[in-house]
Curated annotation (Swiss-Prot):
Residues 343-367 are annotated as: RCL. It comes from the Eukaryota. Keywords: Protease inhibitor, Serine protease inhibitor. The lineage of its organism: Eukaryota, Viridiplantae, Streptophyta, Embryophyta, Tracheophyta. The keyword Hydrolase does not apply. This is Serpin-ZXA. Probable serine protease inhibitor. GO terms for cellular component: extracellular space. The reactive center loop (RCL) extends out from the body of the protein and directs binding to the target protease. The protease cleaves the serpin at the reactive site within the RCL, establishing a covalent linkage between the carboxyl group of the serpin reactive site and the serine hydroxyl of the protease. The resulting inactive serpin-protease complex is highly stable. The keyword NAD does not apply.
Length: 396
């Protein structure tokens, strides 16, 4: 993999983990202590890179530095193009995960998209551009966007634009959706799934269904953290998707773990299990999360405020003089993740050193309290989904 692609992916991961830490902070109104959270930083990254393609001046610079570190907007588009080709291609025909990604630009009919922007959107981002009538038919446009997302995500995400989210003053909506469904390389035996106690952050506990297994697993143990890697079946290409469960030792260790990931973006890379070990007690709860939020406030808190303000420069997007008054009113994002015995259904909008050792000690992995998870493509290190589970019983 090219060095510049590695650097871009490192920036994408640090953007992902900054967002995850902000969303999983107990203070955040959308996420916070009471909800399970799932979102796709990859999906948001690509949507914002597309905004950068239509931005000029300080707005473009701010987007480029938030998303890609020191570098140009052109670098972002090249990266997006590689992501769409490398990571987001569907592999279900060859028995690998089903991946469906869609990007849409919905612009009011009074504005015409600049050809250069349209070319980048369609050519590099595989985005669809739609000319719509926000001024007199806002509600109809909203349902058009929603049915587009529903189609792409195989019906898992039915509504990315909530009622009232667009009106006659809306000029531009960017929507994106990501659907992922993978089967575990080693499925869990459903007859072994049993109810057990899951400890909540407030000290109470609930009875939840836990999957268990006696087969060897990829587990790494540290003083205050255990990491489990669950690989998905591969298709005919080199990609290898995996889910990682990061289980803090402390029952209430979730927030400090999220903060650690945020402050050390390379934390995950350094803590990836590469060897299967014999398991002792193994318990992982089934869970299903549907999580949607409006991301602009969160993005502003990470220093991205120009695209959302009246000072936004999105003049590279549309031809008309009205382009000067154009800004991003909101960014709606929705994700869906389900983990069960078969695998995962999710949507959104090294060199091995082998050492001989004495008889292996069986490793326990009992996820009976809140934990973080992420889904990553291991060859590139691209993070597709991040989230946390505070209570596996919460309905999706």
């Amino acid at each position: 993999m090219a060095a510049d692609l590695r650097v871009s992916i490192a920036h994408q991961t640090s953007f992902a983990l900054r967002l995850a830490a902000a969303l999983s902070s107990p203070a955040h109104p959308a996420g916070g202590a009471g909800r399970n959270v799932a979102f796709s930083p990859l999906s948001l990254h690509v949507a914002l890179s597309l905004v950068a393609a239509g931005a000029g001046g300080a707005t473009r610079d701010q987007l480029a530095s938030a998303l890609g570190g020191p570098g140009s907007a052109e670098g972002l588009h090249a990266f997006a193009e590689q992501l769409v080709q490398l990571v987001l291609a569907d592999a279900s025909g060859a028995g690998g995960p089903r991946v469906a990604f869609a990007d849409g630009v919905f612009v009011d009919a009074s504005l015409s998209l600049k050809k250069t922007f349209g070319d980048v959107a369609v050519g590099k981002y595989k985005a669809e551009t739609h000319s719509v009538d926000f001024q007199t038919k806002a509600a109809e446009v909203a349902s058009q966007v929603n049915s587009w997302v529903e189609k792409v995500t195989s019906g898992l995400i039915k509504e990315i634009l909530p009622p009232g989210s667009v009106d006659h003053t809306t000029r531009l909506v960017l929507g994106n959706a990501l659907y992922f469904k993978g089967a575990w390389t080693e499925k869990f035996d459903a007859s072994k799934t049993k109810d057990g106690e899951f400890h909540l952050l407030d000290g109470k506990s609930v009875q939840a269904p836990f999957m268990s297994t006696s087969k060897k697993q990829y587990i790494l143990s540290y003083d205050n953290l255990k990491v489990l890697k669950l690989p998905y079946q591969q298709g005919g290409d080199k990609r290898q998707f995996s889910m990682y469960i990061l289980l803090p030792e402390a029952q209430d260790g979730l927030w400090s773990l999220a903060e650690k990931l945020n402050s050390e973006p390379e934390f995950l890379e350094k803590h990836i299990p590469t060897r299967q070990v014999t398991v002792g007690q193994f318990k992982l709860p089934k869970f299903k999360i549907s999580f949607g939020f409006e991301a602009s406030d969160l993005l502003k808190s990470l220093g991205l405020h120009l695209p959302f303000s009246s000072e936004a420069d999105l003049t590279e997007m549309v031809d008309s003089p009205e382009g000067k008054n154009l800004f991003v009113s909101s960014v709606f994002h929705k994700s869906f993740v389900e983990v069960n015995e078969e695998g995962t259904e999710a949507a959104a909008a090294t060199a091995a050193v082998i050492t001989l050792r004495s008889a292996p000690i069986a490793e326990d992995f009992v996820a009976d309290h809140p934990f973080l998870f992420l889904i990553q493509e291991d060859m590139t290190g691209v993070v597709l989904f991040v989230g946390h589970v505070v209570n596996p019983l919460l309905a999706a």
